[in-house]
């Protein structure tokens, strides 16, 4: 991009004058390159604010910047005063006077609403220096813009923002270095984890990874526990620290829906993920089921396509977010879906913060802690970046508690366990034909679940993990048999 402070040559100004609206637009671009952009996806003007780009609401500054073009024309008109006075040849003098008159007419036109809007309209048809698309923004996963620069997440160093980097989402706090302290925050995390330092360190690595724009871990952390356990405090504090880089999403985006929304219409929920580093889904009602297809889509690395209601075009972008689910109720997840269990990790929040602690898993609540933590914003930002640096060397490195909790969760979701308990008998002397077992399972499922029956292939995969399946003309399961009637009949 051209340096907007560079003096514009007179010949260039005169050429722009001769090209009418297209010339006005060309001169506008020369004066505003590096200061303004036109997002042609949304039709919005953007402004450079030191280290990142922001939306120019109502295009007010883009419109006001037309005065820079007016100023160039006015300076040229003033230069012509001496040239007209010095001109001896009448024809030359008349030509200069006509050019000056045209400059003043152009100035008057550009100071009208119609003239300004026309010039901005033509700007979109000129060179590409001021034209971008929505998917051009926020593509560097290792850059974290903040109030006083851009943090390099690979090193923890700060550099000045560059308009060419097209960074838009930013953290609204200053970077004060890796050593900025956050003692109350670190104690709060440790308290939430019941003094388990291994878990507190894991939370640090997890969020450290999450502030990158990478999706290499393909992970869905589920923060689970009964109410008043610090989940909301943790999330709201991170939202305060990270600003628009962390945001909530509707939990319905992750759940099975009775009616599917048309994919051809606007989908602002997906569009809201553009450029985020951390996305939080809050609370799921008891008995709800995760949508495996949605979870895989929203926690994967494949590009997403979305459009806001008033956008002119769809935007295709690669995800930059880590998605978290915060819930008091564990949603149902198919135990046989190996892909989703590779993503899902259950992180228990087992401590409750209450006014009058009476039980071993209760602690005294500090109702002012949320406001106190805001004072540690710079330190919490440093804590996040330190976690990112540790993650780069150690990976997420799941603690034993996380692996055990996730395994227990998966066992709870084993849809065949109740069927085997109610309809089968186990012993090495028993065997059952696979087709008979599936027929019995289908009847049991329809009576008890009322939803679509898992396919025979899926059922077979799960049962084959538990019982020896052999083929003798047809498949048999060895080690279990069918009861003549269910136990509760």
Regions found by a protein language model. Name each.
Residues 63-77:
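Active-site-surrounding "flap" and adjacent substrate/cofactor-binding loops of secreted or lumenal enzymes
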